[in-house]
Amino acid sequence: MPRKGNVAKRDVLADPVYNSKLVTKLINHLMIDGKKAKASSILYDAFGIIQDKTGKEPVEVFEEAMNNVMPVLEVKARRIGGSNYQIPVEVRPERRTTLGLRWLVSYARLRNEHTMDERLANEIMDAANNTGSAVKKREDVHRMAEANRAFAHYRF
């Protein structure tokens, strides 16, 4: 526990092209070794691919994908009486977006397309259509929470 109190949460600046804080957070999750220009060019290229393939506004497709990827429930391990229980808990809004972005980027990196912008674009479009690995991960997390519903009364 920190002695000097909690550190204030820094708010990210909105993205200059799409004017969206969620897009900035996605760029930050894509970024490796501080190469933000490279991450943003990958994202904008991916959004261009989404625009070409769907004909819709890429930010709207991305927000739809995020709504399909963000988890509502998750399980937390808690030790009670010498045994560990997986207790389902509701996910806080900020953690929901963080997990959604993390899963979207990590499963995009695991795809087999040739370039990262293609991988990211296809993962976002799949997530918007309620398919894809990131949505499957969310379903798995929800299934775990549902399976351990009997332990919900333990509360964190």
Swiss-Prot record:
PROSITE patterns: RIBOSOMAL_S7
Keywords linked to the UniProt accession: Ribonucleoprotein, Ribosomal protein, RNA-binding, rRNA-binding, tRNA-binding
GO cellular-component term (any): small ribosomal subunit
Molecular function in Gene Ontology: rRNA binding; structural constituent of ribosome; tRNA binding
CDD domains, alphabetized: uS7_Bacteria
InterPro entries attached to this UniProt entry: Ribosomal_uS7, Ribosomal_uS7_bac/org-type, Ribosomal_uS7_CS, Ribosomal_uS7_dom, Ribosomal_uS7_dom_sf
Subunit: Part of the 30S ribosomal subunit. Contacts proteins S9 and S11.
Entry's family note: Belongs to the universal ribosomal protein uS7 family.
UniProt protein name: Small ribosomal subunit protein uS7
